[in-house]
Amino acid sequence: MSVQGPRLVLDIRALTPNLRRPLIMCLVDHLLGSDATETIVVISDHEPAGLGYQLELRRETRGRVGFSYDQRLDGAWVALISLKP
């Protein structure tokens, strides 16, 4: 998993669970609305498969973002949300 170009790193491990997903969606929506090209790197303490599923289901983001994730050696999960042009 590699990131090329500008990236925004968001470590959500210290946030309460009820704030995590809304914060990520708000950030993705804002960047999509501003024609940004950053890749969002989300660091989490659990597998983020549900986040990718939600991005595909949402009307606002469906087909407009790429999503992949992997687990680091230290146990943290890293998800990449890439904005499609």
Put a short name on every predicted segment.
Residues 27-36, 40-69:
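Short, hydrophobic/π-rich interface segment
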Residues 64-85:
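C-terminal edge-of-domain segments
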Residues 3-5, 60-62, 72-74:
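A generic structural signal for short, non-catalytic loop/turn and secondary-structure boundary residues
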Residues 1-35:
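An N-terminal amphipathic alpha-helical segment
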Residues 18-23, 50, 75-77:
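Residues in flexible loops and secondary-structure boundaries
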Residues 9, 39, 78:
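A residue-level signal for beta-strand positions that form part of recognition/binding surfaces
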